[in-house]
Each structure stands twice: as C-alpha cells, then as structure tokens.
C-alpha cells in the first residue's frame, strides 16, 4: 500500500529532489509543468499503481545530483544523457554506478520507459546498431530470423579473425523493437546486437565494421529489405565511439519503442545455439537486471579487460587499415558532417598502437643501449624489456631485437617478432620510468652521463635562483623516483627498495636541495673559477661573475623558506592525478623487502616504479626447501587444526587465493567452531605472512547501518590493495548486514575517505573472513547472499595441560583433541617465509584447478541457511499443511501472526510484509498470487474436523 505522504511527492524542476507538497505548497508553475512533462514522456502502463510513479521520480532525483550544468557543460566528463524530455547531461561516478543501476532497474520493472543513454569509454563491448530505412509504403518488418543469424555469423567470423575469444565469451545478444516506426516519411526498423563479454577499443571496431559492410554486400544478406539507405548508414558508425547507447529498456523518444532481447546466441564449433526459449519470462526482475548489465557500453573498468588479439594478427596492419578508413571518411564529400565527426572522434581513436614524440622515441632508444647482457640473458627480464618497449611505441621493435642480440645463444629474430605482436594484445603498465630505472641500475655511469647534458642546461637556467628553475632541475634529476599524489594535502611518494613509500611533506626531496644541488652548483662554481683563469680578459670577467653569482644560489639552496617554495613548485611539476588510483592496483604482484613476486609470470624479480606497489610483506623473499624444519613444523600445525586431508587442502588453497587481488570466487568465508580450535592462530600466521597486505576490519562495518557517502570512512580507506581482511567476532545479538557483504565480494568499485582527505575509489581485492564461535544471524534469504557465504568448520580442540581432566591425562585425548602449544605465538613469526612458499605452491595449483569446496563446507553452509531462515522457522511453528485447496491464510493475516511470534523468539526488527510475501511467492508452491494467500495451510491453533492436520514441518514443500 502507498501512504498518503508518498502520493503527494513530486519532482522539483530545479533540484530534481523529491519534495512533499504538504511542506512546499508554493510550487511554481514552471516546476509543475516540468513534472507533467517528465511523467507524460516517461510512459507507464495504465494498470500500474500510483506508487510506481515514485520509482521514476527516485531515479530522476538521483540523476539530478550529478547533472552537468551550463550550456557548454563543465570539466566533468559526461557519462549519461537523457535524449528526450526532461533532457540533460550527467556525470555519474563509478562508485555510484551500482546504486544508479538499481534505481534504473526499479523504474524499468515498474513499467517505465525512460530515454537514458550512456556514453562510451575508450574501451568497451562490441555493439552494433543496424538501422533499416524503408519507404512509407513498406511499413511491415522485412528482416527475418535468417537475416539475424546471417548477421551474427558474419560478425562472429570477423571477431575470430582479430580476437582470441574463449567459447564462454562468445555470447551474442540480439534485441528488437516492437515494430517499425514512421519517422520523417520513412519507416525505421533495426537491430541492436551486443557482445557483452568481449572488450575492444573503438579503433578495432572501426576495422570490423568496414569488413562487415564488405561481407554484407558480398553475400547480399539484406537484399530482401527494401532499403532507402546504403549499407554504410545501415551500420551506424557513431555508435562505436560518440553516439549515446540506449540503456536496456530505454527508448529514443515517446514515439519510439525500446529494444528488448529476442535472441541469445552461443557459438559452439561455428554453430549458433539460441538459448532464449519461447515462453521464457524475459521481463522478470532477474532477467532485466542481467540485461541492463550485459547491454551496458560502460561495463568494463580497465584496459586490462581488453580481449587479446588472435594469434598472427599484426597490430601494424590494423593501424594501416585505420589510416585508410580515416582517409575515406575525410574524402567523403557527400556527408557535410564528416569532417566535424572526424574532429570529434580524434586521432587517438584511429591509432591502434601507441606512438610517442620523436624526442621521447630517441630517448627510449638511447636508454635501451645501456641495458646489461645479464638482462638480455634472463628470459623474464628480457621479456619485461620487450613489454615495456612495445607499450611505449611500436617503432621500438628493432631496438628490442638489437638488445636481444646481446645474448647470441638465445637470439631468434622470428621469436622477437612473434612475441612483439602478442605483446600488443594487452597493454602493460610499463612506461619510460621503467626504462630509466633499468638503465640507472645496469650502467649508472653512462646513464648519468647521458642525463648530464640536460641537467647542465638546467643548472645554467637555475643561476637566477628562482623557485621554478630550481624545481625543474630537481625534478629532472629525480622525476621517476618522486611523485606528488596530492598538491592540496601535500602527499608525496618516493620509490625506494622496490616500492613506493609515502614521505611526509616530501622531506627527503627537500633534503636533496641542500645535499645534492648544493654540490652540483659548487662543482659548477669550481669549473667556472678554473675556466676564468684560462680565459681572455672579457670572458674571464664573465666567468668570474657567474662563479660569484653561484655563491648567492648556494646560499638560497640552504635557506629553509626558499626550499619550501621550491617544493611547492616541484608539486606542480611532479603531480600525477592518477597516482593514488593506480597505487597497489596490480592484482598479481606481492612486494617484499628484496623485490617483487609476479604471480602471473610465476617469478621473483626486482621491483620497478611502474609496478606501483606501496604495500609490503616486510620481510625478504627466500625460497625454502620442503625438507626444511620450518615446513615440517607448519605441516604439523595444519594437520592438527584440520585433521581431515580434504579440508586441509581446501584451507591451504583458499588462503593461497589471498596472495592475489582477484576476487573471482566472490565468496565470504565464515570460520567457525568452538573456542581453542586453532582458527585464530591460523589467521595470525596469515597476518605475519602477508604483512601490509593483511588488515583486520571492525565488525561494526558488517553489523551497523552504512554511514552517508560524504562522511569519512577511514576503516575502508586503508583497505585499498589489501588481500586478506578478517572481521572480529560479532556479539550474540548482532545481525550481518548482507548489503556490505555483497559490496565486499561483488567486485564493484567502492568509495572511501580517510580523515581530512579526498574520497578514493577502488575495487576491493581482499578476501573477507569472519571468525566466530557462534554463527551470527543473517535474515536475508536471497540466493545472492547464500551463494557467497561459505561456512568453514574447525572441529579440533586444543587443551592446555593445566585445564585437562584426570581422564584426559590418564587415558589420553579424544579424537580431534590435541595438547595446546603454549609457545606457538612465539613460533608463528618465524614461519612466515616458509608459509609464503607453501601458499605460492598452492596458488599455482589453484590457477590450474580452481577452488573446490568440500562436502563438509557445503553441509555446514546449508545448515547455517536453515538456521537463519526466519520464515521457515515461523511457518514450521505456526502452520500445518492440509489437502484442502480451499483452506488457506492471507499473507497479511500471516504477517500479523508473524509479528507476535517474532517478538517472542527474536530480537531486533521483524522482517516486513513485503519480504514475507516474496518468500512465500518464490519458496511455497501453494501460494495464490491473485488472492495473495497461502493455500493448503492453516494455523496450528485451528481445529480441522476432517482430521487433515499434519503437524510435521518435514512435509512442507519448499521450492528453490
């Protein structure tokens, strides 16, 4: 039921916020008119209740918070638009995307048909918009399912030509509108086709589109459609890069229809299998949610999501094709908007491979010449150089080949060329910073000699001793070692010991002004004095004056106030707005004191600036042999806390996933069992092993309501890059907030803000663990919650000698009982390096075989769900099943009884009637939706004269 207060709500035209007419009676005519426009243009079926209008109003109010104002917009990029009344451009942050999609989903489920489009990123799924223009006298639909299949088959062949697509990713969604629409004297029909699990750049989609048009002409797949437009305009090129893509369920305007999914093809051995079965409820909430997500052109969040190129594809050949396409567009004089469109597109969309300036290219070539023979001999460092060069500029292939020749015994030109092509499949994080770092390590003398020319020029510029000139000199010397992450908050990082370390107010850089630059200028002064003694009278005076002037410069360099000014200037030069966003974002790197372990490559190596690592295990990586005493002690400990071998293997595999920041399991792990069972000690060992990558979380984050997004959340802000996150044991009365649990495990971007700092956005990398002796209450019964939960029992018991009974001392300990090692806490820190080696071993197994949950885990999880199912508990206490279908109880009567029952059996707030209705609708087969009642069930208090009462909860049939 909708309350009277809800019915009085409207949308303000100025703020878009929901207001109450009882408190805002002076609504202007303008706002009233705007509300009418909004409601009239966003259509809804007449049968829907007034309450459902609020679903649209809530969505609109949310979007208005992120509206980009001004005729020419603002500096904020536009992520979404409304292409019809009430119109508007919006910038919806990544961390608000989930909330936006939930509100949008609610509006679509409620029957609304908005006009919302989303704009493209620099990468995204393959999307195709086919627009068939037909004469006015041909108003029917001419394309058939054969046409659709031909389109998909042709495009599949093109995709396989260019991309290495797995079978599971080769899914094609086809969406159609209800019927052709008459517009400007022509009928417009069409198809929307999406490949949601393939990620590409717009540049490659241009090449694919060009090939598709050629094949479509060759095979005449549209010959039965009386087209008035040519094939170039049938396949809209704008949808690849600039034209807004309609969100699923939206439409262009009130005279058009939304596109709805009609086919879902999976390509297996070049055969198309349609997984849409006639009669499927494609408009259920679950399906709508799925389609909204899969049809979004903004569904990918990183260049790492790019689908790799197929074997043998030459990126240079793709780039050459793009240049021809660009020339073709520029020469197309028939389209007056072509040049404008090309300008809007920008050159970067027509470049498939990276290219830098000539100056940077020459610099890169000179740096590679300084690399050592050892770097060319070791496969991994050799390959790392290749990845770095290919990520900087495609023209550096010959330089990699020349570098490879430093190890003649391993050099193969063909292998270099093949790997180079593969390197372009996916970009890396490597930049010029890595080249500089390698060169400075391999040949420091020649490296500093190479930089000397530029530095000498800056030293001469610095003779005026201004803040800016000195800052330029300082940053040129250390530009790849120091980064300013925030000018406002004075956050600086220094690359030291294989990782980035935050330095307070750039104090180490500040010290270099007095320690290094003073020496640079003192050396320059000595040179000038020496030259002055060997010059003629005129030049002698000039050299002498310059040398004297350096004395003033040195004095400034030792002045605290001057140094503060230099550091402020340095911040402007060294500021990297993306530094904090990229920090600790590589899921496959683990930082040690002596280097970095690359999980993807399976090697230990030196760290480099482009690794962007700040977190560290805080000890050196050492390979330990399995025969070592440490390994034996660790295995002995593990055998006691998990005597069952399958459970022990599972635990080790699970903990090994904490090495990686990927969250493919999307699980929330509950470690449970009576006290003194070893689970806390196991987590303590993991803490020592992971170091900075392990950080506990306050249980209140899981049990209390979430604070507003604007308030500080330091308990979340310091979890960026963390790999394992245990929660304290909850109180007996605590309930788990499943919303937060889903956020931590769902892979969505979250927002957090440390005290007095700007908000940060990141995807959680950590695996969440809840340690508890007694399982807490979880009232949610949705499958999304229980799919994530995994209950891991710890069945052992550790007994102290001082607490043992006489029977234990005399007859020995029972099964799964062990004597407690009172010195274990002192031993655990010494096991960290051995345990790390053990986890790395199991991580390699995990990458091959995945994580398989044992029966014991599944069994305890199912039992936990039954225990938490408050509705099943209530039905078992209050209802009995009868064979008479005329017998039953309404949901509202059932709810009234449940409220009283709940007060007697539980603490906290009773679930609402909507949750109860949802439960019986989906879990009880005798629910009558039209009557809103549960048939074949009566209250136990009722007396059935026919003797049909069944007082047995086991006879209640539960679906799902």
Swiss-Prot record:
Top-level lineage group: Viruses
Biased composition (Low complexity): 12-25
EC number: 3.6.4.-
UniProt keyword list: ATP-binding, Helicase, Hydrolase, Nucleotide-binding
GO MF: ATP binding; helicase activity; hydrolase activity, acting on acid anhydrides
Enzyme class: hydrolase
Segments forming domain SF3 helicase: 646-807
PANTHER family referenced in this protein's UniProt entry, alphabetically: ATP BINDING PROTEIN-RELATED, SF3 HELICASE DOMAIN-CONTAINING PROTEIN
Protein name: Putative helicase L207/L206
Species assigned in the record: Acanthamoeba polyphaga mimivirus (APMV)
Biological classification of the source: Viruses, Varidnaviria, Bamfordvirae, Nucleocytoviricota, Megaviricetes
């Amino acid at each position: 039921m909708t309350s009277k207060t809800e019915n009085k709500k409207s949308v303000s035209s100025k703020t878009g916020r929901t207001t109450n007419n009882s408190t805002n009676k002076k609504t202007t005519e303008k706002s009233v008119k705007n509300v009418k426009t909004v409601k009239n243009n966003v259509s809804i079926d007449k049968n829907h209740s007034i309450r459902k209008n609020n679903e649209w109003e809530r969505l609109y109010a949310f979007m208005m918070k992120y509206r980009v104002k001004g005729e020419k917009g603002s500096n904020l990029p536009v992520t979404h638009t409304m292409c019809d009344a009430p119109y508007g451009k919006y910038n919806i942050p990544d961390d608000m995307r989930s909330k936006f999609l939930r509100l949008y989903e609610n509006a679509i489920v409620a029957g609304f048909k908005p006009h919302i489009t989303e704009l493209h990123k620099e990468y995204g799924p393959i999307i195709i918009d086919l627009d068939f223009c037909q004469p006015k006298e041909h108003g029917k639909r001419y394309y058939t399912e054969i046409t659709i299949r031909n389109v998909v088959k042709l495009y599949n062949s093109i995709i396989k030509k260019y991309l290495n697509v797995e079978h599971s990713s080769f899914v094609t969604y086809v969406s159609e509108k209800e019927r052709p629409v008459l517009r400007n004297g022509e009928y417009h029909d069409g198809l929307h086709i999406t490949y949601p699990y393939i990620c590409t750049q717009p540049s490659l989609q241009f090449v694919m589109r060009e090939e598709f048009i050629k094949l479509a002409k060759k095979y005449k797949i549209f010959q039965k459609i009386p087209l008035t437009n040519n094939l170039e305009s049938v396949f809209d090129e704008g949808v690849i890069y600039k034209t807004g893509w309609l969100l699923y369920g939206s439409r262009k305007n009130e005279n058009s229809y939304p596109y709805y999914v009609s086919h879902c093809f999976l390509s297996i051995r070049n055969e198309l299998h349609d997984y849409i079965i006639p009669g499927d409820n494609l408009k259920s909430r679950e399906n709508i949610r799925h389609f909204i997500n899969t049809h979004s052109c903004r569904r990918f969040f990183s260049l790492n999501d790019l689908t790799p190129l197929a074997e043998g594809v030459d990126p240079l050949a793709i780039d050459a094709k793009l240049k021809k396409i660009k020339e073709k567009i520029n020469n197309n004089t028939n389209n007056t908007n072509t040049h404008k469109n090309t300008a809007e597109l920008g050159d970067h969309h027509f470049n498939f491979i990276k290219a830098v300036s000539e100056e940077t290219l020459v610099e890169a070539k000179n740096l590679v010449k300084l690399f050592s023979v050892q770097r060319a001999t070791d496969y991994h460092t050799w390959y790392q150089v290749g990845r770095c060069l290919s990520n900087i500029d495609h023209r550096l292939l010959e330089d990699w080949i020349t570098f490879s020749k430093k190890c003649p015994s391993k050099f193969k030109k063909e292998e270099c060329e093949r790997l180079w092509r593969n390197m372009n499949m996916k970009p890396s994080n490597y930049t010029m910073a890595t080249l500089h770092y390698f060169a400075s390590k391999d040949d420091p003398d020649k490296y500093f000699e190479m930089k000397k020319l530029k530095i000498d020029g800056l030293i001469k510029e610095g003779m005026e001793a201004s803040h800016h000139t000195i800052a330029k000199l300082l940053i040129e010397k250390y530009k790849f070692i120091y980064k300013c992450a925030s000018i406002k908050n004075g956050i600086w990082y220094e690359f030291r010991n294989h990782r980035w370390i935050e330095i307070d107010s750039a104090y180490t850089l500040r010290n270099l002004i007095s320690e290094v630059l003073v020496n640079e200028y003192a050396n320059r002064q000595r040179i000038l004095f020496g030259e002055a003694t060997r010059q003629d009278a005129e030049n002698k005076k000039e050299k002498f004056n310059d040398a004297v002037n350096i004395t003033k410069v040195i004095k400034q360099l030792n002045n605290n106030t001057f140094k503060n000014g230099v550091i402020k200037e340095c911040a402007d030069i060294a500021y990297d707005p993306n530094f904090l966003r990229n920090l600790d974002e590589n899921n496959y790197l683990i930082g040690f004191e002596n280097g970095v372990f690359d999980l993807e490559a399976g090697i230990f190596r030196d760290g480099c600036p482009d690794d962007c690592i700040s977190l560290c295990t805080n000890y050196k990586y050492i390979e330990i042999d399995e025969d070592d005493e440490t390994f034996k002690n660790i295995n002995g400990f593990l055998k006691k806390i998990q005597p069952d071998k399958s459970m022990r293997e599972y635990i080790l595999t699970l903990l090994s996933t904490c090495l990686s920041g990927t969250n493919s399991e999307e699980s929330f792990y509950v470690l449970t069992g009576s006290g003194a069972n070893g689970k806390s000690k196991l987590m303590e060992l993991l803490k020592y092993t992971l170091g900075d990558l392990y950080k506990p979380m306050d249980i209140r984050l899981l049990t209390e309501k979430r604070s507003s997004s604007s308030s500080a959340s330091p308990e979340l802000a310091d979890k960026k890059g963390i790999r394992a996150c245990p929660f304290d044991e909850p109180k007996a009365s605590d309930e788990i907030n499943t919303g937060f649990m889903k956020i931590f495990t769902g892979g969505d971007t979250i927002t957090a803000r440390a005290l007095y700092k700007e908000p940060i956005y990141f995807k959680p990398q950590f695996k969440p663990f809840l340690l508890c002796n007694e399982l807490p209450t979880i009232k949610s019964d949705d499958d999304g919650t229980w799919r994530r939960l995994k209950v891991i029992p710890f069945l052992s018991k550790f007994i102290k000698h001082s607490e043992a009974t006489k029977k234990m001392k005399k007859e020995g300990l029972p099964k799964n009982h062990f004597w407690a090692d009172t010195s274990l806490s002192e031993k655990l820190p010494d096991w960290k390096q051995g345990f790390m080696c053990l986890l790395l071993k199991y991580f390699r197994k995990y990458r091959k075989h995945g994580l398989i949950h044992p029966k014991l885990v599944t069994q305890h999880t199912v039992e936990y769900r039954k225990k938490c199912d408050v509705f099943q508990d209530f039905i078992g206490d209050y209802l009995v099943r009868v064979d008479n279908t005329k017998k039953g109880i309404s949901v509202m009567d059932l709810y009234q009884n449940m409220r009283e029952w709940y007060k007697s059996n539980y603490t906290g707030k009773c679930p609402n009637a909507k949750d109860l209705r949802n439960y019986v609708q989906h879990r009880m087969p005798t629910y009558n939706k039209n009557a809103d009642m549960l048939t074949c069930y009566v209250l136990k208090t009722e007396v059935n004269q026919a003797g049909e009462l069944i007082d047995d909860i086991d006879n209640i049939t539960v679906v799902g």
